[in-house]
Amino acid sequence: MENIEGKEEQILIRITGQDRPGLTAAVMGILARYNARILDIGQADIHSTLSLGILIRIDDMHSGQVMKELLFKAEELNVNIGFAPISDDEYESWVDHQGKNRYILTVIGRSLSAKQIAAATKIIAEQGLNIDFIRRMTGRMSIKYPERNVRACIEFSLRGTPKDRELMQSKLMHLASEQEIDFSFQRDDMYRRMRRLICFDMDSTLIQTECIDELAARAGVGDKVKAITERAMRGEIDFKESFTERVALLKGLDVSVMQDIAEHMPITEGADRLMSVLKRCGYKIAILSGGFTFFGEQLRRRYGIDYVYANELEIDENGKLTGRYVGDIVDGKRKAELLKLIAQVEQVNLAQTIAVGDGANDLPMIAEAGLGIAFHAKPRVKATAQQSINNIGLDGVLYFLGFKDSYLGEQGKL
């Protein structure tokens, strides 16, 4: 159709109803005939129910005819349609707000209820943040086979700046503990979907045990090692001193005991799924552990891990532990240094790094990483880390990275 120049106006078109193939194409076909320009568009489909919004700019000489044709087409397609004029000032105000900060709030649990979401969105509102869109990250929930529903995750895209981020984080942590759900609140920038290096603690993170406790139990010194650990936790001795004392108690233990423990290490829920996806997507993976390389190497072989840095136990010519270690101790400070070193070697920006751990020794690397996650962590670590997972498995990390179950296909299933 020939376009006769005139004054232009903005019209917001809203369409709801039963979705079907070709509906959007039919609407766009009408708009195309009148040379309408698309200023904004968004569509959502929930249980085959469509919600489509289109903001157009069109010559006001044609706007009446366009709306008339769209009304007839909506009736033909059995959908609801509405129109709202948008003034130039309103439109420009909307454009000016596009530079506002964006954040992503991820909510994860074994299941999610209206009560939990109501509490989370109340905190969002109190902080003056606006929800741009909401999407489900996990697969569809079966009513017939509830045992298949192992986790639920919803992601909120938010716009604005929190009035008090520290207070918001505190309220989210309290809600997480009270409602048995997990949260991640992070800036939605280009690095969020471009993470490239992930560093894990090993004991009580990738595996559900503390290897030094297993070794101590086999050596018959479990109570002594536990007492030293408790002294360290009270701050009576530092990590290096406590580590040296505990290793000394393992003197004489046969290396075959280590092999037996390594072969039967309990793998953390979700670790297999997480590692499969990370390797498939090209992530570099590191273990940075205050534990022992012997067990880290077992995990390297299992998952194809790229880097393992842990503590080396000295073994004598008879295959017995000497009660000493070789090289420098990997403590919290060293973990943070190693994260930065590996990032440099791999030419990865620190904003593209992830650190996951449970203990106080993990806090330095969690703080250093672009995304630091406390996993089933000690209270002090949970209180310090910006993101935490306490109620589901290790594969919950995937949702913090923006993965949807629908992206993962068969390899992403349990």
State the predicted function of each range.
Residues 31, 190, 194-240:
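Active-site neighborhood of HAD-like aspartate-dependent phosphohydrolases
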Residues 90-99, 185-196, 229-255, 411-414:
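Long, charged amphipathic helices and adjacent flexible linkers at domain junctions
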Residues 211, 216, 220-230, 234, ...:
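Acidic, glycine-rich loop-and-beta core segments that form the ion-binding/anion-interacting portion
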